[in-house]
A protein has these predicted regions:
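N-terminus-centered regions that define maturation/targeting leaders and the start
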Residues: 1-197
Length: 197
C-alpha cells in the first residue's frame, strides 16, 4: 500500500521536486502480544536507499534502479510496555523539526533513538543535528526505484533493551537478537518520482 503524504518528511512539488511534508507518525495498532513478552520494540526502515549519493537529487540525472541498496532507519523505539496496543497518528511526530526532535513524545517509559536523518543532514548548517524519533519518507526525487518502508514490531523477553543515549536502529537490531518472541510487520511504499508507480 502507498504511504499517504501526511506521514512523509517530503512530498512531491512540481516546481522544486520536493518540499517538506506534514511528517506525522502513522497510527499503528496490534494485538496478540505473547504473554511472556517483557517489552516491545518498534523499528521503521526504508530498505531501498541508494548506497551511493552521487546522483541523488541531481537535476538531469537519475538514481538507477540497479544501484545496490541499503537500510535507512526512520524510527526506533524501545521499552514499549507489553500492555500498550496502539500509537495514535501524530502522537510521536507532527511536522518537520529542523535539527531534529530532541525529546519526542511516546508511550510512557518508552525510549526513542536517533534516525538516519542524523547522518543524512550531517554538516548541513540549517538542518544538521540529532534526529530522535520518527521522521518519515523522503526518498530521492530522481530515484528510479519505488521505496519500501517496513514497520516492524518485536515482542521481546527483555525488560529493558540494552542500548542507551543516542542509540541507532542498527544497535537495537543487534541488541534484540536472540530475544524476539514474536514479530509483526507492515510494509508500505513511497516515491517522490512522478514517473515511478
Amino acid at each position: 500500500a502507498r504511504i499517504p503524504g501526511e506521514f512523509a518528511f517530503c512530498i512531491p512539488d512540481p516546481a522544486q521536486h520536493a518540499i517538506f511534508g506534514a511528517n506525522r507518525n502513522p497510527q499503528l495498532s496490534w494485538s496478540d502480544v505473547p504473554a511472556a513478552a517483557r517489552s516491545l520494540v518498534l523499528i521503521c526502515y526504508d530498505s531501498d536507499v541508494p548506497t551511493r549519493a552521487d546522483d541523488v537529487n541531481q537535476e538531469g540525472r537519475t538514481v538507477p534502479a540497479s544501484l545496490p541498496r541499503a537500510d535507512f532507519f526512520h524510527w526506533t523505539m524501545v521499552d514499549i510496555a507489553p500492555t500498550v496496543r496502539a500509537i495514535a497518528t501524530g502522537a510521536c511526530a507532527d511536522g518537520v523539526v529542523a535539527r531534529g526532535k530532541q525529546s519526542p513524545a511516546g508511550p510512557a517509559g518508552a525510549r526513542q533513538g536517533i534516525n538516519d536523518y542524523t547522518l543524512w543532514f550531517g554538516g548541513d548548517a540549517a538542518m544538521g543535528g540529532r534526529y530522535f524519533g520518527y521522521d518519515g519518507p523522503c526518498p530521492p526525487w530522481n530515484d528510479e526505484l519505488l521505496h519500501h518502508y517496513h514497520f516492524v514490531l518485536l515482542a521481546t523477553d527483555l525488560a529493558r533493551c540494552p542500548v542507551d543515549g543516542a542509540f541507532t536502529g542498527a544497535q537495537v537490531r543487534a541488541a534484540v537478537e536472540g530475544h524476539v518472541l514474536a514479530e509483526a510487520r507492515l510494509t508500505g511504499t513511497y516515491t517522490l518520482n512522478p514517473s515511478v508507480r
